[in-house]
Amino acid sequence: METRLRVGVPAFDGEPQPDGSVIPRVPDGKHAIESGNPNLPFLLRMIPVPRNCVAQIEITRLIHVETNSPPITPVPTRELQETEDGRRSVKETLIPRGPGFERNGFWPVEPLEISYAAQGTQRWARIVFHPLQYNPVQGMLRWNKSIEARLVWNEQKLGSE
């Protein structure tokens, strides 16, 4: 049993920051995966999982373009602060750069990832597509314009994952 998946990002934009870095944006993209790592957008799809199965991702087609990039802003952390008058507020704070900035390779490593979630008796596959991957050492941005993949569902024994 398999599920076919096709995702495309026809364009992206960079939101300039005061320090000269940028935060890339894509249509319908979400942000903030891990504080300290490059602030790159991702797209999320939720797919119901067939009973007692796990999926293996097979990328069948990937169209990408690599280009030079200005520095990408790290994902900030959020801290709860209390003002003098006792009100609380959330403040974004930059933390030391995370592992995504330390490697000479693209981050995230894979353009497509899968994890599982349960809601009551239903299981869901959380498919994360990374339309942009960043190599901070070389200052390169990989734009994954289009990806096609197969999710091959393999039955598993109960109680193991």
Task: Locate predicted features.
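Extracellular pro-sequences of secreted precursors
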Residues: M1-E161
